[in-house]
Amino acid sequence: MLCVCLKIQINGMYKKRLIVIGGGAAGFFCAVNAARICPDLEVIILEKTSKLLGKVRISGGGRCNVTHACFSIADMIKKYPRGGSFLKKAFHHFFTEDTIHWFRERGVELKTEADGRMFPVTDSSQTIIDCLLKEANRYGVQIRMNRELKQLSAENGRWSLRINEDEIMQSDFVCIASGGYPKMAQYGWLSNAGVEVENPVPSLFTFNLPESPVRSLMGVTVENARVKVAGSKLTEEGPLLITHWGMSGPVILKLSAWGARELAARNWEFSILVNWLPDYNENSLRDLFQQKRFELASQKIANRNPFGLPNRLWEFLLTQSGVREDLRWADLPAAAQNKLIKNCCASEYAVKGKTTFKEEFVTAGGVKLSGIDVNSMQSRKYPNLFYAGEAIDVDGVTGGFNFQNAWTTGWIAAKGIVSNV
């Protein structure tokens, strides 16, 4: 077995070492800031794959949704289904304004879009990647690819790490920034080290509707819909996209995040009720229908869509309600009207399975927050063991919130490590 346990001697003193596990956003942010604040610290990033900053690269359709233009901590923490109370304290150390300022200082300007998401003005994730790689190079951060941590143990006041099958490294400090794993078994090396882990389940996924004819509307987007999980309190509102496999869009992703554990317990098989006109309930929509019967009496219902719904969706709802294409508003039978109102306000669809939303797929679960000091990101149980990013039991909805968690916890971990050097 190859043993790599070098100690660098400077002016008669040994240079302390930090090993960061994970070459993602949180890992890089911890590494480059620790190296910048403490030049005498040897910093090494170990990435188990051959690619660095993978989520940064694909986030936001390749533009990188760096953060969200929310400047109130009280409002920000509402975007995290798990870990909001923890982040309420963490955000006092490093928040949205700090993220914007940090990147601006390094020549990266961010812009805000109408929905609050923030991107580099270049509209390219490569801008963020280049910035982080440049910082790593500037401060001498070593990057080692295809290095998977297999075992972590404390030995003689330092950490011993078994990498791949035949390499041993030692370090004074370790920061776990390995991201989330979808299966508990993948946390084995962490659990074996005595770290308590909350059972992981997927979050931010889309819904499969394999037997639903609504899939024929692939590509149709509704600007605002309300979706409720039947038999549950889970309800969200927002843009909805119909896909060839089912439903996606911000409203579905938010629902999957807030319902991550409940939906996993149902094995991702459940029914949803979609209100395509969330400003109305069945009673108020019935009143509006009566009004339209007079206003549009001579016009064909199929040709006159008074609700602003996409035409393909409107025609689909008419078909599902048994309304003929040539039927006029004045001639709409009461039974057909009631069915159409029901389908507009509470269309029911059977969900059977999920599909990963690759751009922002996260997991609910990870290192239990009760075992982490929020002011340093250090383990309460093991000195000089730190955490950052999605490795901990924090996850946000889509919109830049998971990256803000990465920047914040990476920053706090860097400061916490340096204070112990």
Please describe what each predicted stretch is.
Residues 37, 49-51, 72-74, 92, ...:
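Residue-level recognition of phosphate/Mg2+-coordinating polar/acidic sites
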Residues 16-45, 413-417:
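N-terminal Rossmann-like FAD-binding beta1-loop-alpha1 element of flavoenzymes
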